[in-house]
């Protein structure tokens, strides 16, 4: 079984925030692969279904923790324990300010790099889970990060957000088979984005963008 969790904050106030792109990604995966409506379970909105692969369907649980972003690990830990899963069975989708907008990277293990949601998951299940990092860009200065991640995507940004989410869903069979390297490559093939230093990109923007 595969457990796919998205990080985000619950409720309509936060729904379009950059911090909620993890929720957006798992919603698109659930929609693309015909998962049933989510229900309250494991301190989350949870939906169980399957992702079709060349080797057959892979049973998958999609989680949107309702604990608020920084406590997401409690939900992931409960579900993992219930299904007796290993960290390698868990994929967490989340926003990554240290990647340029639209960039996508898979990673297994490592530190939290200042992300409190990832730190929470690691505190519950250990660090060796799989991370799907969705680049949202950096505002350029540390003191601007909080406002940046808790602000909605601008309309212009949806030109890369929507293709990225669709690519994450369309390529999901590779994720379900555990081939994270090919999954990353296929997502970036379907939704290419320029590789750049997100802080330098921020410096080139007019104020207020």
From Swiss-Prot:
**Annotated site residue numbers, Discriminates between blocked and unblocked aminoacyl-tRNA:** 9
Q: Where does tRNA bind?
A: 14, 68, 70, 116
Key word RNA-binding present: yes
Residues at the site labelled Stabilizes the basic form of H active site to accept a proton: 95
- Any Gene Ontology CC annotation: cytoplasm
InterPro entries, A to Z: Pept_tRNA_hydro (IPR001328), Pept_tRNA_hydro_CS (IPR018171), Pept_tRNA_hydro_sf (IPR036416)
Any one Pfam family here would be: Pept_tRNA_hydro
Q: State the active site.
A: 19 (proton acceptor)
Tell me the GO BP annotations in alphabetical order: protein quality control for misfolded or incompletely synthesized proteins; rescue of stalled ribosome
Cited Gene3D superfamilies: Peptidyl-tRNA hydrolase
Q: Which UniProt keywords apply?
A: Cytoplasm, Hydrolase, RNA-binding, tRNA-binding
Q: What is its EC number?
A: 3.1.1.29
Where, per UniProt, does this protein localize? Cytoplasm
**Reaction(s) this enzyme catalyzes, per UniProt:** an N-acyl-L-alpha-aminoacyl-tRNA + H2O = an N-acyl-L-amino acid + a tRNA + H(+)
Report the GO molecular function annotations: peptidyl-tRNA hydrolase activity; tRNA binding
- Write the signal peptide boundaries: none
- State how it assembles: Monomer.
Q: Tell me, what does this protein do in biology?
A: Hydrolyzes ribosome-free peptidyl-tRNAs (with 1 or more amino acids incorporated), which drop off the ribosome during protein synthesis, or as a result of ribosome stalling. Catalyzes the release of premature peptidyl moieties from peptidyl-tRNA molecules trapped in stalled 50S ribosomal subunits, and thus maintains levels of free tRNAs and 50S ribosomes.
The record's family statement is:
Belongs to the PTH family.
- Identification of the protein by name: Peptidyl-tRNA hydrolase
Tell me which species this is from: Phenylobacterium zucineum (strain HLK1)
């Amino acid at each position: 079984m595969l457990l796919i969790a998205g990080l985000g904050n619950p409720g309509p106030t936060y729904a379009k925030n950059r911090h909620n792109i993890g929720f957006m990604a798992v919603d698109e995966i659930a929609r693309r692969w015909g998962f049933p409506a989510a229900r309250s379970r494991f301190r989350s909105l949870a939906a169980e279904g399957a992702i079709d692969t060349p080797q057959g369907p892979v049973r998958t649980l999609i989680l949107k923790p309702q604990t608020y972003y920084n406590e997401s690990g409690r939900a992931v830990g409960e579900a993992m324990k219930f299904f007796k899963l290993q960290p390698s069975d868990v994929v967490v989708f989340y926003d990554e300010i240290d990647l340029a907008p639209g960039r996508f990277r898979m990673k297994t293990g490592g530190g939290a790099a200042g992300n409190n949601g990832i730190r929470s998951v690691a505190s519950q299940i250990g660090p060796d889970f799989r991370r799907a990092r969705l680049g949202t860009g950096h505002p350029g200065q540390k003191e601007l990060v909080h406002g940046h991640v808790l602000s909605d995507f601008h309309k212009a940004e949806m030109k890369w957000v929507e293709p990225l989410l669709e690519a994450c869903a369309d390529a999901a069979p590779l994720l379900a088979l555990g081939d994270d390297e090919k999954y990353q490559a296929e997502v970036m093939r379907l939704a290419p984005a320029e590789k750049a230093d997100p802080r330098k990109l921020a410096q080139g923007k007019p104020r207020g963008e």
